Amino acid sequence: MKYLYATQHLTLNAIKHAKGGHVGMAIGASPILFSLFTKHFHFDPDQPKWINRDRFVLSAGHGSMALYSIFHFAGLISKQEILQHKHGQINTSSHPEYAPNNFIDASTGPLGQGFGMAVGMVLAQKLLANEFKELSDKLFDHYTYVVVGDGDLQEGVSYEVSQIAGLYKLNKLIVLHDSNRVQMDSEVKKVANENLKVRFENVGWNYIHTDDQLENIDQAIIKAKQSDKPTFIEVRTTIAKNTHLEDQYGGHWFIPNEVDFQLFEKRTNTNFNFFNYPDSIYHWFKQTVIERQKQIKEDYNNLLISLKDKPLFKKFTNWIDSDFQALYLNQLDEKKVAKKDSATRNYLKDFLNQINNPNSNLYCLNADVSRSCFIKIGDDNLHENPCSRNIQIGIREFAMATIMNGMALHGGIKVMGGTFLAFADYSKPAIRLGALMNLPVFYVYTHDSYQVGGDGPTHQPYDQLPMLRAIENVCVFRPCDEKETCAGFNYGLLSQDQTTVLVLTRQPLKSIDNTDSLKTLKGGYILLDRKQPDLIIAASGSEVQLAIEFEKVLTKQNVKVRILSVPNITLLLKQDEKYLKSLFDANSSLITIEASSSYEWFCFKKYVKNHAHLGAFSFGESDDGDKVYQQKGFNLERLMKIFTSLRN
């Protein structure tokens, strides 16, 4: 037990040094992490993101010091990094933060999402294992472990993702519950009254209950590995054990004091000094956690050597390297669409068909709307065919997004998912977390404006684009035709470290002669030009057609008009000043048009003489889509009034 106590002592000291932290879980759940990492967990100390490593997700991320203490004694985190806990060091931040070169498999902290990402990791593993089973059944035979707290299990997303894990029989998933019956404001029983055994068994899980004795946790994990179902292990723990706030909800977060250290030393019969731990402890951890990994990695490398001449091996390496350039560069042809003058969602179907080949590693998730959004490759799904690229999630948008993040974190897979734009809010917390981790997930949102029509204001998403654009590292495309759609689709396929969102229409849009897929990647470009224009009109998506119609009216009045198509305002705002000044004219007026409440359009005011914006700032109604669109001011008469006011 002294090795476990050493990690707990380090945890207390590191949190005291940081001037406070989540002592309760970091101490109480430490037997879970200790048993896992000293007996079961497989990874490569020299290659943190080795494809066949076990994955560990601390969904209750506030217990991070329990993990960092083990990493320190095993030689994976330095003394200096421990001393910087919560003070600017990514490897020991308050909540675990994923990086491409560290030993954290997912950024966590927003409760429930770690559970969902773990489900995504195991789903990705299952898909990859099936894809390459002809090579070997040992290429993807790892486990994913996730530690959850009571807060994780109270979040709605945990219910969503646990059903998915049960439906798809993700038996490589082992969830360990830090069941301490206490949370920040109260005892758990005051806010939760469910039977966890019944809850998980009802959705196809294996359930195990144990106390926090190391040997019992060990045996529970061994038993879980023998199951053909995902396993939920409820571990009875004690929050802030061996401190003055033991088993009290005040123990969730506090600053350890001298009384705590005296209590700890008395109850554990230890006498450690902060960062003056015996060499024998470091030696034991390196032998127990690190040295046992060598044979596992050596066996895997030998397996790869034996497979390198197999026909599937090149595909395997392209997939696990996430070499999206090799997989998708020059795969799309904007000219090969079934029908022009279509809704931009229809082009999605065309482009998905173009990359529907055995080398593509794209998998599509949808929230029960594939027949409306066309986020689907072929006609089957995973329930019917283990080789299918389509994964039905049901009406679980938040679960879908957390699972997508987990699949991207696992590696080897490109993942696309989506729903109607009005429901992007359901996924927003996971979109934000994926962007924070620089994950190349790909969202498609359709039904993007008032012209959804009869479904009414609940389905008319005037307010969603600014929400998506406001998230750092999220690249939002709103194309106006097939060429711009192709560019946005291609950008999403090739992205290595950025979340891509493609926003598409349900209503048909006319194909436009002068649109340009290459220029689309600048975010905006001149679609129609007149030198020394009196007026510049900039628009995105369906409003580009309205701009073209208005230009025809003004041309008859001898007004010189320049039209800018702006399919990606975020990319455009990142262009240099020279390019931006080439689009605008200091002597011209500017009208910007978009059926959304986005504020970014006002950033262009400084480049022109004066500026007015036609946007959408109110809910719609249930009526004919074109009628609602017109009533909300997206018509030639309204534009003429705006132009007249600018001239005056």
Swiss-Prot record:
Record: residues binding substrate: 22, 252, 345, 372, 447, 455, 506
One Gene Ontology biological process: pentose-phosphate shunt
Root EC class: transferase
Active site residues of this protein: 397
Residues given in the record as Mg(2+) binding sites: 150, 180, 182
SUPFAM superfamilies: Thiamin diphosphate-binding fold (THDP-binding), TK C-terminal domain-like
Reactions catalysed according to its record: D-sedoheptulose 7-phosphate + D-glyceraldehyde 3-phosphate = aldehydo-D-ribose 5-phosphate + D-xylulose 5-phosphate
Cofactor(s) in the UniProt record: Mg(2+); Ca(2+); Mn(2+); Co(2+)
UniProt cofactor note: Binds 1 Mg(2+) ion per subunit. Can also utilize other divalent metal cations, such as Ca(2+), Mn(2+) and Co(2+). Binds 1 thiamine pyrophosphate per subunit.
Annotated binding of thiamine diphosphate, by residue: 62, 109-111, 151, 180, 252, 423
The entry's keywords: Calcium, Magnesium, Metal-binding, Thiamine pyrophosphate, Transferase
GO MF terms held by the record: metal ion binding; transketolase activity
Family matches, as Gene3D superfamilies: 3.40.50.920, 3.40.50.970
Pfam families the UniProt entry points to: Transket_pyr, Transketolase_C_1, Transketolase_N
Cellular compartments per GO CC: cytosol
Family annotation (InterPro entries): THDP-binding, Transketo_C/PFOR_II, Transketolase-like_C_2, Transketolase-like_Pyr-bd, Transketolase_bac-like, Transketolase_BS, Transketolase_fam, Transketolase_N
Classification via PROSITE patterns: TRANSKETOLASE_2
Quaternary context: Homodimer.
Function: Catalyzes the transfer of a two-carbon ketol group from a ketose donor to an aldose acceptor, via a covalent intermediate with the cofactor thiamine pyrophosphate.
Annotated NCBIfam families: PRK05899.2-4 (NF004558), tktlase_bact (TIGR00232)
Family indicated by similarity: Belongs to the transketolase family.
Protein name: Transketolase
Gene designation: tkt
